[in-house]
């Protein structure tokens, strides 16, 4: 036990060092905010403004009790105390191009004006191309090429907008197709502006057309065609309505002819209504085909026949003992009563 104590005391006597009073340095207070910064710099070589080899050699002698290097120049290089802050002066801290492209583009980003879609319609583009040509006429392929040379936007999706160009040339009267002359061989016809379509755009501004150009001949032809169709339509309607009117209109009864005095003191009205001879004079002059010939004359004395419904004179109510020849009805049958009733009610309603 004593030996171990002696050995510990011996070790302490050998390894302990007590400096003299003149060799003691003044104490240096460390900066609390820069301590974690220096430790971070030593661990992360990418964010350090110094080469990977470490800090540059200090002019002061390095010793076990040497004061730390001044941290004043490190402040401006790390204003944000971040990974990429203050690294613009060194190539080690600059982010690579992949990091920049990997980020999302800002919301206010727009493509360059040279590649933006021009604010012109297809008719305006065709008009500009034709007016810029020396001969004031261009083929379809030349119009395509002129548009692509002037506006880089139309160098993509060519099939889509070229179809629109063809439709605009075909369905607008302001563009005229000109055949090739023999001295200018080639493929495709020329397209030119109509001579009367010079005022489509106001003061040479192609952003919007002042008015749509239409040929007056087509308008006149369209109006005359509509007029002829209306005339034909009215004429045909009149022609179709005429036979209907003739069919539906009842024949006008002739003035009543004097009839002989009835025998046995019977009423004349009852004889007129009951006898079939009273309706036969109306149709004696008509020559009907064999299919339309009327076999029995009693059909015109039906309670709902045209003669009974449209006659001006209301027949007197017949006696109950008088029957119809064709029907063979007895005197007390209710059909006789309904005949006079319906004829009077329809006449009053009209």
Curated annotation (Swiss-Prot):
Residue span of region Disordered: 217-276
DNA-binding region (UniProt annotation): 116-207
Keyword tags: Activator, Chromatin regulator, Developmental protein, Differentiation, DNA-binding, Nucleus, Spermatogenesis, Transcription, Transcription regulation
InterPro entries for the chain: FH_FOXA3, Fork-head_N, Fork_head_dom, FOX_domain-containing, TF_fork_head_CS_1, TF_fork_head_CS_2, WH-like_DNA-bd_sf, WH_DNA-bd_sf
Principal location listed in the UniProt entry: nucleus
Lineage, top ranks: Eukaryota, Metazoa, Chordata, Craniata, Vertebrata
The protein's name: Hepatocyte nuclear factor 3-gamma
One GO CC annotation: actin cytoskeleton
UniProt organism field: Homo sapiens
Record field: compositional bias (Low complexity): 226-249
Expression (tissue specificity): Expressed in erythroleukemia and hepatoma cell lines and in liver and pancreas. Not expressed in any other cell lines or tissues examined.
Regions of compositional bias (Pro residues) in chain numbering: 250-259
Gene that specifies this protein: FOXA3
């Amino acid at each position: 036990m004593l030996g171990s104590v002696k050995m510990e005391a011996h070790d302490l006597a050998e390894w302990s060092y007590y400096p003299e009073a003149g060799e003691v340095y003044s104490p240096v207070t460390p900066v609390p905010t820069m301590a974690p910064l220096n430790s971070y710099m030593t661990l992360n070589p990418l964010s350090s403004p110094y080469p990977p080899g470490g800090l540059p050699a200090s002019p002061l002698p390095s010793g076990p009790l040497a004061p730390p290097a001044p941290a004043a120049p490190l402040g401006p290089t790390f204003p944000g105390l971040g990974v990429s802050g203050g690294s613009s002066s060194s190539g080690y801290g600059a982010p690579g191009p992949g990091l920049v492209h990997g980020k999302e583009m800002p919301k206010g980003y727009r493509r360059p004006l040279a590649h933006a879609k021009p604010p012109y319609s297809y008719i305006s583009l065709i008009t500009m191309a034709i007016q810029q040509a020396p001969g004031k006429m261009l083929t379809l392929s030349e119009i395509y090429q002129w548009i692509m040379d002037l506006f880089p936007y139309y160098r993509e999706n060519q099939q889509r907008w070229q179809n629109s160009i063809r439709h605009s040339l075909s369905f607008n009267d302001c563009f005229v197709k000109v055949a090739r002359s023999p001295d200018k061989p080639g493929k495709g016809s020329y397209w030119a502006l109509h001579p009367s379509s010079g005022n489509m755009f106001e003061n040479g501004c192609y952003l919007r057309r002042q008015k749509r150009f239409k040929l007056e001949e087509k308008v006149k032809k369209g109006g005359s065609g509509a007029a002829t169709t209306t005339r034909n339509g009215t004429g045909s309607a009149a022609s179709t309505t005429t036979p209907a009117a003739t069919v539906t209109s009842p024949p006008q009864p002739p003035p009543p002819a004097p009839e002989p005095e009835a025998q046995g003191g019977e009423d004349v009205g009852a004889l007129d209504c009951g006898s079939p001879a009273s309706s036969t004079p109306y149709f004696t002059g008509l020559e009907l085909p064999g299919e339309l010939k009327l076999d029995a004359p009693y059909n015109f004395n039906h309670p709902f026949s045209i003669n009974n419904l449209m006659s001006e004179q209301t027949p007197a109510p017949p006696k109950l003992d008088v029957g119809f020849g064709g029907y063979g009805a007895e005197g007390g049958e209710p059909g006789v009563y309904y005949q006079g009733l319906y004829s009077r009610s329809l006449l009053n309603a009209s």
